[in-house]
Amino acid sequence: MAAAPSRLDSVITLAQHRGFVFPSGDIYGGTRSAWDYGPLGVELKENIKREWWNSFVRGRGDMVGLDSAIILPTAVWEASGHVKVFSDPLTESLITHKRYRADHLFEAYEAEHGHPPANGLDDIADPDHPEKVGQWTPIRPFSGLMKTYLGIVDDESGLHYMRPETAQGIFTDFASVLQTSRKKPPFGIGQIGKAFRNEITPGNFIFRTREFEQMEIEFFVEPGTDEEWFDTWIDLSWEWFTGLGIKPENIRRFEHPKDSLAHYSKRTIDIEYKFEFAGSEWGELMGVANRADFDLKTHIEHSGKDLSYFDQNKNERYVPFVIEPSFGLTRALMAFLVDAYDEEQAPNAKGGTDKRTVLHLDPRLAPVKVAVLPLSRNEALSPLARGLADRLRQRRAVDFDDSGAIGRRYRREDEIGTPLAVTVDFDSLEDDAVTVRDRDSMRQERIPLEGLDRYLAERLREV
């Protein structure tokens, strides 16, 4: 008997079947390194971005926003250290000639055996041929930067890099933002945008791709207050995920050992989600790094520009330390889907039960907020239902569905996470009211049309 699909596999199947995510270039075979977000996926992604922006940028008096360029001057990446040290340890299987990140092979070994490989690659089996052990090329560095060329000739004079993080645009604009926004430390700059990394082994659905989106903050503080702010941003980040429905038992904090910190980091703690990948149970959702004064100082040195701050109250000048909460947008999307996914038995019209697939998404994240479902395609019901859907659509995403049995339509809405379904029936023609069904409890309530919009706004946390 075939093994039942894992929860993660079920979510991936649902995501592709219902239009959350499609393989990019699917008609040409697709690629593991990039995915397209379909009608439901783009709505979910936009809702996550909106909640993040409202929580961390627009909703705080000590934050401002920025949208910096994807292609920055090459000098930026030379100064930041990325050209020199932004690389991964690459090894190649002598059996299959597939390439792997050596650190990922070591992590998988440790997860299985409870300790790191004593002899390095000599202890590692080929993933496709477990009986073959130690058949690897020597480890060598592999640049994670994606190159492109600007101008009419593809030579070194036109060499540029696609940004591997959004942070550097914030650092290079620091002085301009400081002057024009009239902010002073402690304050932060938030940004949402695409980044690109030449991953050796993209995979695990949308978790590790070469093109992805980040939601990043660079928070500038007075030296000596950085550890306190570091702890604050860890707590705020944790609360953001749990406040939007992530179960606390499915996330954890992971502190990077000193010897594995990034070249810019004084301290880093990741928040990881229990995706239960094959060979690696946990995956990074976001990280908070104490970048100290590394970035501003290195750009001062290489650009010759003053990126310090003068504190008039203390009559002293200093280079701010930076606390960086960096969220992976598409990883967050994947975690919200996995955490919300559920299969349960629900009563059917015949007195028995059927399997119900449901996404218990927070209403603020749900790609469709309300479904309008006329009981039938009756010529009297349809105009009322369509008019209601058009009116509700002015404030929120609405799905109109008049195809099939009402129970089947409820199930279709449940599996994409629609919080509320509004049924227009023949009584609606007489009493000017509709039946509102709750996704999670399946309870139904009769609501007058006159107060429906206010009722929905309260239930959907729009007010």
Curated annotation (Swiss-Prot):
Q: Which PANTHER family match?
A: DNA POLYMERASE SUBUNIT GAMMA-2, MITOCHONDRIAL, GLYCYL-TRNA SYNTHETASE/DNA POLYMERASE SUBUNIT GAMMA-2
The protein's location, in the record's own words, is:
Cytoplasm
Name the positions where ATP binds: 197-199, 207-212, 284-285, 328-331
Record-level GO BP terms:
glycyl-tRNA aminoacylation
Q: Assembly and partners?
A: Homodimer.
**In UniProt terms, what function does this protein have?**
Catalyzes the attachment of glycine to tRNA(Gly).
Name listed for the protein in its UniProt record: Glycine--tRNA ligase
Q: Name one GO molecular function term.
A: glycine-tRNA ligase activity
The family database entries (Pfam families) matched by this protein are listed as: HGTP_anticodon (PF03129), tRNA-synt_2b (PF00587)
Q: What is its EC number?
A: 6.1.1.14
**InterPro entries on file:** aa-tRNA-synt_IIb, aa-tRNA-synth_II, aa-tRNA-synth_II/BPL/LPL, Anticodon-bd, Anticodon-bd_dom_sf, Gly-tRNA_synthase/POLG2, Gly_tRNA_ligase_bac, GlyRS-like_core
User: Please, which domain of life does this record's source organism belong to?
Assistant: Bacteria
The disulfide bonds in this chain are none
* Entry keywords, A to Z: Aminoacyl-tRNA synthetase, ATP-binding, Cytoplasm, Ligase, Nucleotide-binding, Protein biosynthesis
Organism of derivation: Leifsonia xyli subsp. xyli (strain CTCB07)
> Is this entry keyworded Cytoplasm?
yes
Q: What is the lineage of its organism?
A: Bacteria, Bacillati, Actinomycetota, Actinomycetes, Micrococcales
